[in-house]
């Protein structure tokens, strides 16, 4: 049974119809990778899921009945906060607070949003930094960390508030090639632990290896979606075949920290 469902998501920017009636749902523990060319609407769609962008139309609902938002109506502050507490975003550019240590960045949501005790939040934050392989970097500031390390801090921060769903917007696109693997390995670990994730990515082999389902978006539409294996081996839509041909997917690629 699906955990989150959205229907008929419509979004315009300055007269440009960016999302043209997107229907989507995701099950608890499922990992969905969204692929697509630049300008396809994939990042905009992801940002709509926690109101970083506001669609003009569409419905978002958690299927347990706890939250339903009609984007054509005024959204209450209570519903907005409820949605953001149930989802966490991992950004392309990390978006860490520059004057706070890695530990303080991870603690932020627990202390400020969830009002947890600082000592308890510190203990949890250290545990999460250990999970992503950065406990020994806890006291360093973002400027003292590599891009891959900053992104892993961002992932730890996203996990800290125990979200129902993690939204990741091209988490490796700003990284030097040699740093990509450490982030992908971390995401692979989270997938194995059963976290629910939607990942906008251009890492084709990673999507094939880790995602339960892969979606191709183009021109504001979902063109095709299927299990990862069938998406890459038996694409049904001509647009998907062209996209995969242009991507020149490598046959084998392993990721290491």
From Swiss-Prot:
CDD domains the UniProt entry points to: ABC_HisP_GlnQ
Residues in ABC transporter domain copies: 4-244
InterPro entries: AAA+_ATPase, ABC_ATPase_HisP-typ, ABC_transporter-like_ATP-bd, ABC_transporter-like_CS, MetN_ABC_transporter-like, P-loop_NTPase
Any one annotated GO CC term: plasma membrane
Classification via SMART domains: AAA
Keywords: Amino-acid transport, ATP-binding, Cell inner membrane, Cell membrane, Membrane, Nucleotide-binding, Transport
Name of the molecule in the record: Probable amino-acid ABC transporter ATP-binding protein HI_1078
Organism field: Haemophilus influenzae (strain ATCC 51907 / DSM 11121 / KW20 / Rd)
